[in-house]
Amino acid sequence: EKVQTSIDNSLCFGVYQEKKQIGFARVITDFSTIAYLGDVYIVEEKRGHGISKWLIETIMNYPELQGLRRWILLTGDAHELYRKYGWTDIADPAKWMELHNKNVYST
């Protein structure tokens, strides 16, 4: 239910090969000032073939996402991929805060 709600309230991008989904990403945005890029995923056996690059280019060039002041994302291992598209480390991380409810999905 939580996954479906997150998809329903996001701009979602899928990558398909022979009718099988091999990639996904979603953007949470107000379409005016800010966007959060999240849940970028390519199935393991398709990685290393430029699919993630194509997906990021597609998202960054999507007409409704042009002119935003700020994009943000969290990534554990793809910093170099995003740097190719102009992403940088947060200039002043001391200004950023988060509220992380680690138990929100527990029942």
Could you tell me what each predicted segment is?
Residues 46-55:
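Conserved acetyl-CoA pyrophosphate-binding loop and the N-cap/start of the following alpha-helix
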Residues 43, 57-66, 107:
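Intrinsically disordered, low-complexity, positively biased terminal segments
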Residues 65-72, 76-101:
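Conserved active-site alpha-helix within GNAT-family acetyltransferase domains
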Residues 18-19, 45-46, 60, 100-103:
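Short loop segments at secondary-structure junctions
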Residues 1, 16, 93, 106-107:
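Short amphipathic alpha-helix that is part of the acyltransferase structural core
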Residues 42, 55, 74-77:
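Hydrophobic alpha-helical segments of small multi-pass membrane proteins
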Residues 2-42:
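A conserved beta-strand-loop-helix scaffold within acyl/acetyltransferase catalytic domains
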